[in-house]
């Protein structure tokens, strides 16, 4: 029974649970890798060995956190669980394809881990730039295995995207227009469109890299008329939409959490929120070369990419101020998800401001590949995406399980995590401004102080992760069942009960259009 239920599942709730468990497991692997990085950098001098093994760890940390933690949890976990409930659909549009989307991930993860275990590992960074990723600098199967891993993860995401787009457009009640669906549904829809348009470009780029390595083509080799810069354009045309894919579902979840715990029936400026997400999705495709300011582009090209990048701050600002406006005049309940949401708004804004700094091409030439960039994207990911995931998990855990988490423990956990991530990443701004480069396992001892502080912060974050596991165990051990849920009229996912039955909406939801 268990085998057929979990291996052959076509139920969106079960598949969502599989995604959440897989993502949590991968998140712990990614956390372990990050602690190896911070251990190496905690003092000058070598700890683990040479820069190759260090860069293999950095590369694996990035891939694990992006493709096996954030995306499976946000899109696969929360998306699968909540989207059908929020639009009144009995399941996803293609339930068996949904199952395949999940089961492509463990083999993909296995290939990624295998790439670290053969030869010298793939020490290329998550960008996998040639010629470093070519068959001279990386002889052996490591990079090839990484490419195959990315192929599988990419196919998984493309299939998932097709599924979500079809479900959201096609399976809501006829009386409901797209502009009456919850913001999280919009966020997943826009994310799915971004995935569908960007991943094939990555697939093309890494497939050409694969043939350059194995079939003697020269797509990225100047000796045969190729150009390594072409790879960078292909990669970043995927890579920049990807970072918006990582944060957009978080935007949707934060909108729900802020409205719920402010006691509001809807977020402030619903239409503005939707259009802002659409604008971010569109603009995300036309700014990719801001990752390449140092490759020698024309000044007019640099001017365009600087300006276009800064424009993204406008719809992002619309969202931030709409969240603050949602809080205004509400009866605010200071429960843990609200703490995560407020932390998200503040820290994501800090990360966004350093992003505005880096958008200036002249400044970026100086700051490129320093720890300033690392600090920037970890503020929007480690404190944006992760805070959104944590807030959403604490908020919707009673829906998924029927049990409540211990509110005091979750608040302590938030406090520890907040201190840990800020202590880890805030000093990295100082290191970057002082010129410490990324992707090196050692540094001059002038940089010792802030690296040590950063590494201490990472240990505090680790203790928060361990505390979270305890909180999860405590909830299932104590079995405090959900008594009642407030505001279900405007939060439709709660209306079928906690937890909802295995099959919901077996007959279509009836919606009376308001005249």
UniProtKB/Swiss-Prot annotation:
Record cross-link 1'-histidyl-3'-tyrosine (His-Tyr), residues: 240-244
Any single Gene Ontology cellular-component annotation: respiratory chain complex IV
Bilayer topology term: Multi-pass membrane protein
Binding, Na(+): 40, 45, 441
Keywords associated with the record: Calcium, Copper, Electron transport, Heme, Iron, Magnesium, Membrane, Metal-binding, Mitochondrion, Mitochondrion inner membrane, Respiratory chain, Sodium, Translocase, Transmembrane, Transmembrane helix, Transport
Residues that hold Mg(2+) according to the record: 368-369
Binding, Fe(II)-heme a: 61, 378
Superkingdom in the source lineage: Eukaryota
Coiled coil residues, start to end: none
Membrane topology, Mitochondrial matrix segments: 1-11, 87-94, 171-182, 262-269, 328-335, 401-406, 479-515
Binding positions (heme a3): 376
Signal peptide: none
Chain positions recorded as Cu cation binding sites: 240, 290-291
Topology Mitochondrial intermembrane: residue spans: 41-50, 118-140, 213-227, 287-298, 358-370, 434-446
SUPFAM superfamilies xref list: Cytochrome c oxidase subunit I-like
Functional summary from the UniProt entry: Component of the cytochrome c oxidase, the last enzyme in the mitochondrial electron transport chain which drives oxidative phosphorylation. The respiratory chain contains 3 multisubunit complexes succinate dehydrogenase (complex II, CII), ubiquinol-cytochrome c oxidoreductase (cytochrome b-c1 complex, complex III, CIII) and cytochrome c oxidase (complex IV, CIV), that cooperate to transfer electrons derived from NADH and succinate to molecular oxygen, creating an electrochemical gradient over the inner membrane that drives transmembrane transport and the ATP synthase.
PANTHER family: CYTOCHROME C OXIDASE SUBUNIT 1
Record text on subunit structure and interactions: Component of the cytochrome c oxidase (complex IV, CIV), a multisubunit enzyme composed of 14 subunits. The complex is composed of a catalytic core of 3 subunits MT-CO1, MT-CO2 and MT-CO3, encoded in the mitochondrial DNA, and 11 supernumerary subunits COX4I, COX5A, COX5B, COX6A, COX6B, COX6C, COX7A, COX7B, COX7C, COX8 and NDUFA4, which are encoded in the nuclear genome.
The protein, known as: Cytochrome c oxidase subunit 1
Source organism per UniProt: Tetraodon nigroviridis (Spotted green pufferfish)
Taxonomic lineage: Eukaryota, Metazoa, Chordata, Craniata, Vertebrata
